[in-house]
Every structure is written in structure tokens, then in C-alpha cells.
Regions:
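Acidic/His-rich, divalent-metal-binding segments that scaffold phosphate/diphosphate chemistry
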Residues: 1-88, 95-102, 106
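Active-site-proximal, acidic helix/loop segment immediately C-terminal to a metal-coordinating Asp/Glu
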Residues: 146-157
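Charged catalytic carboxylate motif
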Residues: 31, 93, 137-140
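A ubiquitous short alpha-helical element
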Residues: 19-24, 78-80, 126-133, 151-152
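Structural signal for well-ordered, non-membrane alpha-helices
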Residues: 94-95, 119, 146
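Active-site-flanking alpha-helical
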Residues: 67-68, 120, 150
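Histidine/acidic-rich helix-loop-helix segments that form or flank divalent-metal centers
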Residues: 57, 85, 98-100, 104-140, ...
Length: 157
């Protein structure tokens, strides 16, 4: 995992900065990364597959850098429809940022697809299982799990 971060230090540093939601976003990304690495071991992924999964997991929310900070401090039930749509665009923003950073296509797919659901109910495209890469499906599952286990304390945000 450390080697993957060293390959793309600028991307990892972006995730740690205040411009990307600060400590809470970084902690969430780290949780998702660690859980994904545990799954990679259990699924007996190759070292290359695990590296891709780990880096994609760490950077899955990098697009939040381009979402206004005030939206990151609102509870989801407080969003207006346009605000919800704007936050949902973080997948697209992440894809753009990842391309600017020169990230490989398999990591870009994780960043772009990490809110897709196998039944087609996710976003940004509403893709179904066969159109979502396996690493993106793993990150989506772990992302959802971490959000359930560690809800954001919006009073502190």
C-alpha cells in the first residue's frame, strides 16, 4: 500500500489537504483503503490488483476537492436537489483530477464508479454489475460500509 502511495504522492497529498474536506475525508479514505486491502488479501488478489485497489480506494473521493466546502458540512437530508446533484458530480470531478495527475485507467475507473450499484441504482451513470469494474464494486461496498460504521458528525464538521 505504501509503495502505491509513493508512486503517486501528489494525489495522496491532495487527499490529506484541507481543500478536500480535511481530516474526515482523509480518515474515511484511509478506512476504505485499509478495509479494501484486507479484502484483497482474503480474495487472494495479485499484488498488482491489490496495489490498484489500494490506490483507487485512497483516491476514490478526490473529486470532493471541487465540491464547495459548505456542502461537505451539510447533512445529506439538508441538500436541495441542485446541491445533491453537485455533490454527486464529485465522481466526474475525480475522474478529471485523476487524468490531470496521470493516473492509470484502472484507478480512474474506481474513482469514477465508486458510487455505482450492481442493480443500476447508483451514480454517475446508473451502471449495472457487468459494466462496473470489480475493484470499483469492492470500493463501493467498502465505502458504503464505512459510511454506516463511521457516520460524519455534522455538528463538528
Amino acid at each position: 500500500m505504501v509503495l502505491a502511495f509513493l508512486e503517486h504522492p501528489e494525489a495522496t497529498l491532495h487527499m490529506m489537504g484541507e481543500e478536500c474536506g480535511g481530516d474526515e475525508i482523509f480518515s474515511h479514505s484511509l478506512n476504505v483503503t485499509v478495509l479494501c486491502m484486507m479484502l484483497a488479501k482474503g480474495l487472494e488478489l495479485t499484488p498488482e490488483q491489490a496495489r490498484t485497489l489500494g490506490l483507487g480506494a485512497m483516491l476514490h473521493d478526490i473529486g470532493l476537492m471541487d465540491v464547495p466546502d459548505r456542502l461537505l458540512k451539510l447533512r445529506p437530508d439538508e441538500y436541495t436537489r441542485p446541491e445533491r446533484d453537485l455533490r454527486a458530480r464529485h465522481c466526474e470531478y475525480g475522474l478529471r483530477i485523476g487524468k490531470q495527475l496521470g493516473l492509470p485507467a484502472d484507478i480512474l475507473a474506481i474513482i469514477f464508479q465508486h458510487h455505482e450499484m450492481v442493480d443500476g441504482s447508483g451514480y454517475p451513470l446508473g451502471s449495472k454489475q457487468d459494466k462496473i469494474t470489480l475493484p470499483a464494486r469492492i470500493v463501493a461496498l467498502v465505502n458504503y460500509y464505512d459510511n454506516l460504521c463511521n457516520p460524519i458528525d455534522y455538528a463538528q464538521a
